[in-house]
């Protein structure tokens, strides 16, 4: 079968490899049909992704069709359309036993710690495979990135009536903003790109959008009844943005890091203390988040149009080499 391998930073190749087979009784062989390209893949290609080694097959935002199942698999059958939870957990560490499988101490993320889905077929344990019958393949492949946003909102313990600023109007950030809106929050978005802000305001139904400026704190207060937001989500993965995020939260507020940066973050403690702020990290997502996102997509709460660029499988190495990642969300299609 065909497979795309990131051999080392800035080097990607289309290769021929043997088709995977069922190895365990609970395995599922999936014919991959859609692959989302996300910041993790882009950072890995550029050599800036933590928790990473080469060579590596990227791809963890996946949709496909069940091609074969192991003898113990009961909830799936050949022909089912599915998506994949790419966070393979040990099930035995303290976080896992507490239900926090998304931050398992021994986690193996498909496409990061283990080879991913940038190929024609992938074998996955059945407990990480979710039926998406009723969703298009395009939509099934965006369940994972949207689940990241949904998890961040749940992690923040957001309640209706709160005000939220999401910094970074990329694929993860707009998911955060949309699910915050669905929870009853007043939502604001901030990004350097006017194009992204125009798209995200419509897609998320945000109350207002901003570009960073010296006046942005006053602009936020003007749009938010004189107050700064109670929760600030940073989805940029940018060190300077993540440190600046503290400035935008009101006293008693929260800052949630949804993005990840391979660097040290610092802040001025007297300001942090004076505001009695809460700083939270949000990592990956759980089965609960995936099911919530699928339900939201099925009931129409999530709009169409999240994917803004389509790429053929064979053209994927060329897309990475060109390095133009300004589109909101790119997706690889393997359908003939």
Please place each PLM-identified region on the residue numbering.
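NAD(P)H dinucleotide-binding glycine-rich loop of Rossmann-like/cofactor-binding domains
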Residues: 90-167
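Mid-domain Rossmann-like dinucleotide-binding core that forms the NAD(H)/NADP(H) cofactor-binding site
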Residues: 135-214
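Glycine-rich beta-strand-centered segment in the early N-terminal region that forms part
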Residues: 20-35, 48-94, 133-135
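Conserved hydrophobic helix-helix packing surfaces used for dimerization/oligomerization
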Residues: 3, 163-164, 255
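Glycine-rich cofactor phosphate-binding loops and adjacent beta1-alpha1 units
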Residues: 198, 203-278
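C-terminal hydrophobic helical "lid"/dimerization subdomain
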Residues: 243, 287-336
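Residues in the short beta-alpha loop(s) of Rossmann-like NAD(P)-binding domains
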Residues: 193, 261, 285
């Amino acid at each position: 079968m065909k497979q795309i391998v990131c051999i080392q930073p800035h080097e990607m190749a289309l290769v021929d490899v043997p088709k995977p087979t069922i190895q365990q009784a609970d395995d599922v062989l999936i014919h991959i049909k859609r692959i989302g390209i996300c910041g993790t893949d882009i950072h890995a290609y550029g050599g800036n992704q933590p928790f990473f080694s080469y060579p590596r097959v990227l791809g963890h935002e996946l949709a496909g069709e069940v091609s074969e199942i192991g003898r113990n698999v009961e909830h799936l059958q050949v022909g089912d359309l599915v998506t994949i939870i790419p966070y393979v957990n040990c099930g035995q560490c303290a976080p896992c036993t507490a239900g926090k499988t998304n931050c398992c101490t021994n986690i193996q993320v498909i496409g990061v710690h283990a080879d991913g889905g940038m190929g024609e077929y992938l074998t996955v344990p059945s407990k990480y495979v979710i039926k998406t019958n009723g969703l298009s393949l395009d939509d099934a492949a965006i369940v994972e990135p949207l689940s990241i946003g949904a998890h961040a909102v749940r992690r923040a313990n957001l309640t209706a009536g709160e005000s939220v600023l999401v910094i970074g109007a990329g694929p993860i950030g707009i998911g955060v903003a949309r699910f915050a809106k669905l929870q009853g929050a007043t939502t604001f978005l901030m990004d350097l790109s006017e194009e992204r802000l125009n798209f995200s305001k419509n897609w998320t139904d945000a109350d207002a959008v901003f570009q960073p400026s010296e006046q942005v704190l006053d602009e936020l207060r003007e749009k938010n009844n004189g107050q700064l937001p109670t929760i600030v989500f940073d989805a940029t993965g940018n060190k300077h943005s993540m440190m600046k995020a503290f400035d935008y939260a009101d006293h008693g507020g929260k800052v949630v890091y949804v993005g990840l940066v391979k660097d040290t973050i610092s802040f001025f403690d007297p300001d942090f203390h004076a505001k009695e702020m809460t700083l939270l990290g949000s990592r990956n997502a759980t089965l609960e988040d995936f099911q919530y996102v699928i339900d939201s997509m099925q009931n129409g709460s999530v709009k169409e149009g999240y994917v803004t660029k389509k790429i053929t499988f064979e053209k994927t190495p060329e897309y990475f080499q060109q390095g133009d990642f300004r589109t909101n969300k790119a997706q690889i299609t393997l359908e003939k």
